[in-house]
């Protein structure tokens, strides 16, 4: 026998979904526990690996789901403050990881966290203060892109992750394995 203690940032659960499907309910439970496993001071990218870094792209993609499941206002307010502090040091660029640990780069979607996360938190909370607090960060990100883009479309010429986890076509056998009991 063993006991585990789950460490995560304090937040109040406010939403969930229950269906008539045991498999879908298990998926929802896994999402809720995955969020707990990834919300410890900063939103980390994946609970199954040792990396545990605050990838901005991952958290911006999950921010609406997180805000549906929990009151994320205080958690994201703190994270967005940290993001802006890193952004100030990088001349408006939003690092791909916050907090950063040395030299970093940015990418579309990852840097867009500066605009998408506050917007999602606002949509779910109705509190415009998050937008007021982050407007300088949002503007700095857009200004950074404009500055890099310049007259020669430089933004298109720098590194971007793109859709690095695109789903490829799968055959009937793979689909059957996924959906069978």
Predicted regions and their residues:
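Active-site acid/base region of carbohydrate-active enzymes
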Residues: 3-30, 36-37, 43-95, 105, ...
